[in-house]
């Protein structure tokens, strides 16, 4: 990015001249977007062309932009070419959206580089689970939590108006507005699906959308206290930035699908966290402080973004009595009594203390619902066979089931109670056995006897695997293994084989959502 800054001179140029618009006509911009070394690959396939980047298509697009030829006029008189028009329009959409996203990210990067001369790397903060140790240290003494689901992004033209505050390039903004009207619909921008064709462009609009909200939040927070924020840096959802400073923590994950934002106030009684379209504001204030924050936030969405804020998307409750749902965990503050025996001289006595502990639980009902949706069990949790995988080899089937089981255990290792995880393991193990028995037209009992303990070995976690190798005769009773909570700091990306379990009623629609799972093999 420093090379871009040298080639494009100063970042202030974007506010004085047409900075981005001329770059849209340069072929090397689209080559950089497609470069696997600079960014993750962007697929321009599945529309009848070769599955690779082609400069001929880019040249045709740039030629049309130079000549100002409207492609709808070209195909209007040819009914037999309407299908071709749809394919070419889809391809041009992918090219332009990638180019727009890449170029409009440059002002974000310049601001980041100007504010942070050196990016401090913290490997622990790369994990998407690093938010929970923060909660354990800071949330146990707090009283109230404001649980907020960020509303769906507004109309794209409203977002373009917000982008003008940090990109004063009239030509590129007009072209962006035309691009939204011609190629995109509001539904396609705010709805994410399995297709990733608009993912990067969606992140561009989503960043501007969330930054406006959090800037407003910071302004209100500074106005509410005599002491202003000690440190605040605006970072964005990109896969190359992750850092940590004294009072502000950011996490950026691979695939640009999630942002973990922790803001620690100078006032230790207030903490703010955001993850995947969900914000949590916890405070130790009185009964009047948190309702005021709730009122300010709701009015901001309605007056500034012209959005009707649903009251079900914001919830104010006490942490001790109402658990909150975050990152596929059910979290709450529990009071645990503890007895301490003290002895003074010859007299001994017991002291009873109540300690607050941050508990995290596995949402077993949504996970079973997701397993039922993926045809591993029914809605009651009874395992069934998966005939779709019957064509694979036996080792491949066992490996698939075992990988999903290990990933679930790996991700939910921080749970306070792991009994429900063994229920999930039972469902997957028996579903695997029934799938193999159906493939070989045998019974489950006979097939398990033929495989022996090697079948169970594939479903063991790393801790259980050590015990299995050390004490093979005692490997079937492993319920006491890993009773304590363990937060793994290697969960940083998506594993496509095990991301089905978050497709539950808690899924946030309309956001670039990271579907968490373990990357551990």
Swiss-Prot record:
Which first-to-last residue range defines the signal peptide?
none
- One GO term of the cellular component aspect? chloroplast
Tell me where it resides: Plastid
> Which UniProt keyword terms apply here?
mRNA processing, Plastid, RNA-binding, tRNA processing
Its predominant location is plastid
Please indicate which superkingdom the organism of origin belongs to: Eukaryota
| TM annotation in the entry | none
Give the molecular function GO annotations: RNA binding
Q: Name one GO biological process term.
A: tRNA processing
Note the PANTHER family from the entry. Answer: MATURASE K
Looking up HAMAP family in the UniProt record yields: MatK
What does this protein's UniProt record list under function? Usually encoded in the trnK tRNA gene intron. Probably assists in splicing its own and other chloroplast group II introns.
Family indicated by similarity: Belongs to the intron maturase 2 family. MatK subfamily.
**The protein, known as:** Maturase K
Q: Give the encoding gene's name.
A: matK
């Amino acid at each position: 990015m420093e090379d871009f800054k040298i080639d494009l001179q100063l970042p202030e140029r974007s506010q004085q001249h047409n900075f981005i618009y001329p770059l849209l006509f340069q072929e090397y911009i689209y080559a950089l977007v497609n470069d696997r070394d600079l960014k993750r690959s962007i697929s321009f396939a599945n529309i009848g062309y070769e599955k690779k980047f082609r400069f001929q298509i880019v040249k045709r697009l740039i030629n049309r932009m130079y000549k100002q030829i409207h492609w709808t006029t070209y195909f209007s008189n040819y009914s037999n070419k309407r299908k071709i028009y749809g394919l070419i329009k889809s391809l041009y959409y992918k090219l332009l959206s990638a180019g727009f996203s890449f170029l409009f990210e440059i002002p974000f990067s310049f601001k980041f580089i100007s504010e942070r001369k050196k990016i401090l790397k913290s490997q622990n903060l790369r994990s998407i689970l690093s938010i929970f140790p923060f909660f354990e240290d800071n949330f146990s003494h707090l009283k109230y939590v404001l649980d907020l689901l960020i509303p769906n992004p507004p109309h794209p033209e409203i977002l373009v108006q917000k982008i003008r505050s940090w990109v004063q390039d009239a030509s590129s903004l007009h072209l962006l507005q035309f691009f939204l009207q011609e190629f995109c619909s509001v539904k396609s921008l705010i709805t994410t699906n399995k297709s990733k064709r608009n993912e990067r462009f969606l992140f561009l609009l989503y960043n501007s959308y969330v930054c406006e909200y959090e800037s407003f939040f910071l302004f209100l927070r500074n106005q509410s206290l005599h002491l202003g924020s000690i440190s605040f840096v605006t970072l964005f959802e990109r896969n190359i930035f992750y850092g940590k400073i004294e009072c502000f923590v950011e996490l950026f994950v691979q695939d640009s699908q999630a942002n973990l934002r922790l803001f620690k106030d100078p006032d230790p009684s207030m903490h703010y966290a955001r993850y995947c379209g969900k914000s949590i504001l916890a405070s130790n204030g009185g009964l009047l402080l948190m309702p005021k924050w709730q009122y300010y936030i709701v009015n901001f969405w309605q007056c500034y973004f012209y959005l009707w804020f649903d009251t079900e998307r914001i919830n104010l409750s006490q942490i001790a009595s109402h658990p909150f749902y975050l990152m596929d965990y059910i979290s709450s503050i529990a009071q645990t009594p503890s007895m301490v025996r003290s002895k003074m001289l010859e007299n001994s006595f017991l002291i009873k203390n109540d300690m607050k502990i941050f508990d995290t639980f596995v949402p077993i009902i949504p996970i079973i619902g997701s397993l039922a949706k993926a045809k591993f069990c029914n809605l009651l949790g009874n395992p069934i066979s998966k005939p779709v995988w019957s064509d694979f080899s036996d080792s491949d089937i066992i490996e698939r089931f075992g990988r999903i089981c290990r990933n679930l255990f790996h991700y939910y290792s921080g749970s306070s109670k792991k009994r429900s995880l063994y229920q999930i393991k039972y469902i997957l193990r028996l579903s695997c056995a029934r799938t193999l028995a159906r493939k070989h037209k045998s019974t489950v009992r006979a097939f398990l006897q033929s495989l022996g303990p090697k079948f169970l070995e594939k479903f063991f976690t790393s801790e259980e695997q050590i015990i299995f190798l050390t004490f093979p005769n005692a490997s079937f009773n492993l319920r006491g293994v890993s009773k304590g909570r363990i937060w793994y700091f290697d969960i940083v990306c998506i594993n496509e084989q095990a991301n089905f379990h978050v497709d539950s009623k808690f899924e946030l629609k309309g956001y670039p959502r990271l579907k968490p799972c373990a990357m551990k093999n």
